[in-house]
Swiss-Prot record:
The lineage of its organism: Eukaryota, Fungi, Dikarya, Ascomycota, Saccharomycotina. GO terms for biological process: Group I intron splicing; mitochondrial mRNA processing; positive regulation of mitochondrial translation. One of its GO terms (cellular component) is mitochondrial matrix. The keyword Membrane applies. Activator of specific mitochondrial mRNAs. PET54 is involved in the excision of intron aI5-beta from pre-mRNA for cytochrome c oxidase I (COX1) and plays a role in promoting the translation of COX3. One of its GO terms (molecular function) is translation regulator activity. InterPro entries: RBD_domain_sf, RRM_dom_euk. Present with 799 molecules/cell in log phase SD medium. The keyword RNA-binding applies. This is Protein PET54.
Length: 293
């Protein structure tokens, strides 16, 4: 009994002094822990390198998030407005960061690679507007992609404020540094959506109409800013950015003037300037894109 008690005491003393069970090998144990830690780190690095963004190419500029939700099995028998988003992805319509033109593609941002692959699997044989869905994981590094998103967001914000702020900000450096979280991405997309709801792009407004003419002519719309972001004087073509104080006016503006002949747009004053304008007008149509559509 005494021998047994003595043996137990020796084991406890050894455990207390070394922190290891008697007979264990320290180097081997440390090596095992190091290997496990290295394995976990490697898995994390591989996960970070895997894509979390899907690219969908389409010439249709009017697709919305509900179109991509509708093809999930969980929503097949639900009405619009009742769709769920268990994979929790965010949709972005890809636009040129300088001129804001739609670039025939959409990005679906997922929280991780597993959610991305699950979406591909669930929608493999689906169709959007009778067109077979084919999505491609985006190989572009996420920081590079997010830098482009930041550039578009910043230029759009500046254009919404004023023409001066837009042109001054075109050459400003944009960089995504540090950890970029899902919440930050949501915040950027939400702010972009809010501005897009209140903004339109207009092709072919008569070149003689200056910004203050636009404000006077369309006095019954609550216009915030209006300026040309692209122009070709020789071809008498221009692209104008117009922002409104509310989304309703932006929607009404497109509905009322999209497709109108440029020469029909002007209601000239009684001062007799028709001859001056007639040389500048042609049969081109006013083309308007509401950025939220």
């Amino acid at each position: 009994m005494k021998a047994s008690s003595k043996a137990i005491k020796l084991v406890l003393d050894h455990l207390k002094s070394t922190g290891r069970v008697l007979g264990s090998v320290e180097s081997g144990n440390s090596a095992t822990i190091s290997e496990k830690t290295a394995s976990v780190n490697k898995q994390q690095q591989l996960q970070e390198k895997k894509p979390s963004v899907l690219q969908y190419r389409s010439y249709n500029p009017y697709l919305v998030k509900e179109d991509f939700l509708s093809i999930l099995p969980e929503n097949l028998y639900k009405k619009r407005g009742q769709f769920t988003n268990e994979l929790d992805f965010q949709l972005m319509k890809v636009r040129d960061p300088k001129y804001f033109q739609f670039k025939d593609q959409y990005y679906l941002f997922f929280n991780d690679y597993n959610s991305l692959t699950e979406y591909i699997k669930l929608t493999k044989h689906s169709r959007i507007n009778k067109i077979r869905v084919k999505m491609t994981p985006l190989a572009q590094p996420l920081p590079t992609l997010l830098t482009k998103l930041q550039r578009y967001s910043k230029n759009l914000y500046n254009a919404f404020r004023s023409s001066e702020q837009y042109f001054e900000g075109l050459n400003e450096k944009v960089d995504v540094s540090g950890e970029f979280t899902t919440n930050q991405l949501r915040s950027i997309l939400d702010s972009v959506e809010e501005i897009e709801n209140k903004s339109v792009l207009v092709w072919n407004i008569p070149t003689k109409l200056r910004s203050h003419d636009i404000l006077n002519y369309f006095w019954f719309y609550n216009i915030r800013s209006s300026f040309k972001i692209y122009w070709d004087d020789e071809m008498k073509r221009n692209l104008r950015f117009i922002s409104f104080e509310n989304s309703h006016d932006a929607y009404r503006f497109k509905r009322n003037y999209h497709g109108l002949l440029a020469k029909e747009l002007l209601t000239l004053s009684e001062k007799g300037d028709a001859a001056d304008y007639s040389l500048e007008m042609d049969d081109s149509k006013i083309l308007i894109e509401h950025l939220s559509e």
